[in-house]
Amino acid sequence: MRSFIKTHKRASSLDNSPRKSSNESPENRRNSQGSFGTELSYPSGYPPNNVLKQSSSFEPLHKLTSNKIFSSKLFKKSSNGKTSSSNTSPLLSRSDAETFAPLLSNTNNIPAIKGTRKHEWGDNDDTSESVILLNRTSMSSMSDTNQDTPDTEIVRIHPNSQQGSILSSQTSADRTPRLSLEEAEDVEDYDITKHSSLSRSQSLKKKRNRLARIHSHDDIMHLRSQSSFSSDLLGSGFSPIPEKSPNPSPLPKYERSPRKENNILDRTNLFDLRKISEASYTAEDESNFNRPFTGVAGGETIQITTSIKDSFVPSPETSHKIRFAADNVIPLSKAQIIENSASEADEDDSNEEDGEEESDSSSRFSFENGNDLCGRTASLKYYSTETNTPPLYVNDIYENDNFDDEMNYFDSNEEEDENMDHLYGGDNTALSGFAGMCTLSDDEFDRTNAAISQELSSHSSQSSKGYTERQRGFSKRDSNKSFEDGNDDYDPSNHCRSYHDIYNLSDEEEAQTINKKVTEPRKRKISDGTNKVTKYADMFLLSDDDAESGSQDEDFGDESRENDVKFNVNSERYGVEHTNLVTTQNHNLNPISFKSPSRFLDVSNVNHSPLAYKTPERNILKSPLQQPIKYHGVSSLLDNDIQGTMKNLYYIDETDEDRFLENSAESEEYYLDEINGIPEDFEFSDDENIMRNLSPLSRLNRTKLLAFRRTHSYSDRPLGVLKDNTPLNYKLEIKNKTVTFFDHNSIHRSYSEPFSSSLLHDSRKSEDNCEDRILDNKTLASPVTPNSSFTKPSPSFTQNSSLSPIQESTTSSDASPKIL
């Protein structure tokens, strides 16, 4: 409550404060406020009615608190003798360092919000109590962001020099400043401070630095869009007033040069634009470069001629000026150099610029988006990327042990398998068909031919044919061990020793039988287990292990054995013992083969091939010409080239499959009769037998159909359902018409096509011409629908599966049926 009373007293004192006399000296006003100088003061002849008045919205508290809740005695002391004094706004006595005043006479529209600023930059006394005007901000008043501000001009008077300067946010042809230049100079003469120039320069520097921190990038960009000044002026910054300057002078003023509005500043000017600490429009005459100005920038003294005329009256032709206060002041010659962007700046003045350029040195492209500098702009930069890919080392992916001296990759597992060949009696690299020939490398092929040529060099006298040394016979020792029978018939040139010998093989040589004894490594890999699948039913008894073992055993059939011995002659090492080739009479191997019988279809090869196309059930079959070949037994070129596709399939005789299906069908029919509740001694009528015989589907065909449905069911085998003679009522309602369909079924439901009852009726009339009646389509009339009465159908009609509609009433048939 005490704080509330104090607030009320303070508001009342502000509301009823006496007007100070106009003849009060500036010294007394300055000492009472405790500031270094009053920014705005009016002469004695200035009318007091034009002073800013209190806002109408700011009501005193005794008017706002006239409720019954508050006691009237609380505010009796507020009405004291001070009310007799004139109600002068305290804005005149409590002004800020930079106070804005209206230029037009209509000042009642501008609300004055009163408050106290607790902290202020600069050397001020503790007794300073300035009043803040919250109508405008310091820099945003010069922009168009404040839309609700009345269209009035704001004048700001700076006491930084004896001449002074009037800053205007805008100056147009139809607007005239409220105060003349003479009156402003009189006010400034009264407000000249007696403080030292050093303290004043320091305070101004701090205030401008404060403004530089407040101004955002948007405000600076908005100045560019409003004034359209020359971007060449932004090529360099300007230092603030130095601390040791004996005579502080106003900042230099530059004229704007005509330039297009849509020109975009380059990157150098945009960088310098960020250094601006204070910028404002200044209305000056065009001829004001007369008085020298001294500035220090990095130890360098620069003189720029500026002047302010004593008498100044703004005119409509006055152009806008901009004033800069930046970090550095550089010569005009250097500004031209920066504008041309052709040379580097001085070492003392370009330290900060060099740091900025170094940060963007890696940028290849940089440009600004947008036609004008309005607000924030997006900068897109493209940086150079490395085109050289990093080297790939062996240690990153593979191990060093998997590469030879020529950096050829090899598998260590394969090398271990090759090193184990000495346990089996030598390196046996027998080829396994055409695919094995393609897997040979050039080095292996050359080593094999070199070994054969060394053997043939000592036994070249035995060759009687015109073949090369690579295609001649082996040594005497190898030939005596290799061949026991038929040495005269054996020709080593007929075996494959090169790629071209593959095409010299005949069908008779390919069909020759082989000896039971093969090389040791191949014999160990052959499985001794017999094939368990002998009929169609055995396929369902196989487990997963049996299926895998069966597929592995098939890879080592007669064909692989034949190829192993046939190409075993091309062994790489010297001490390899070759197997013996025997005749067909000594052959005692199982002639079962699962390979596709493509070559056995040739007529010339029938008498020479004991390995005919066989199934696992039969050992010896007839010639392929007399045996029907199934669709999956027909070979193709793909089957001949790729091994292991057709030979792994099971070929089951269809008779065994049909026998299995017939046995299963009979058992299922028995189960269906039992499920349907049909007694065992049930006798079907003769009519049903006749109808069954006349049905287009005979018993044999019907059995095959049932077998097909059982084996080719997509979801599950069909299950029997108990039949009932109760008809299922199906009704169709069409407005006033109702049609009901009844389904007449017998105990044993048989399959029949539509209108079979008419066929049966015709067959009873003339049994001799039964077949002709069936083929006669004239008797196939539309089903008869009774109009009013329904007679009991004949027994033959009851056996039919057709539907008999019942028409209860007649009406239009344009409506759609409705199924209940």
Curated annotation (Swiss-Prot):
Low complexity compositional bias, start-end: 454-464
Keyword terms, alphabetized: Cytoplasm, Zinc
Biased composition (Basic residues): 1-11
Keyword Zinc carried by entry: yes
Compositional bias segments (type: Acidic residues): 344-360
Region of interest (Disordered), ranges: 1-54, 158-182, 231-266, 341-370, 454-498, 777-820
Biased composition (Polar residues): 159-174, 779-820
Residue spans of biased composition, Basic and acidic residues class: 17-30, 253-264, 467-484
Gene Ontology, cellular component aspect: cellular bud neck; cellular bud tip; cytoplasm
Location of the protein in the cell: Cytoplasm; Bud; Bud neck; Bud tip
Free-text function comment from the UniProt entry: Involved in maintenance of polarized growth and daughter-cell-specific transcription.
Family classification: Belongs to the ZRG8 family.
Name by which UniProt lists this protein: Zinc-regulated protein 8
Species of origin: Kluyveromyces lactis (strain ATCC 8585 / CBS 2359 / DSM 70799 / NBRC 1267 / NRRL Y-1140 / WM37)
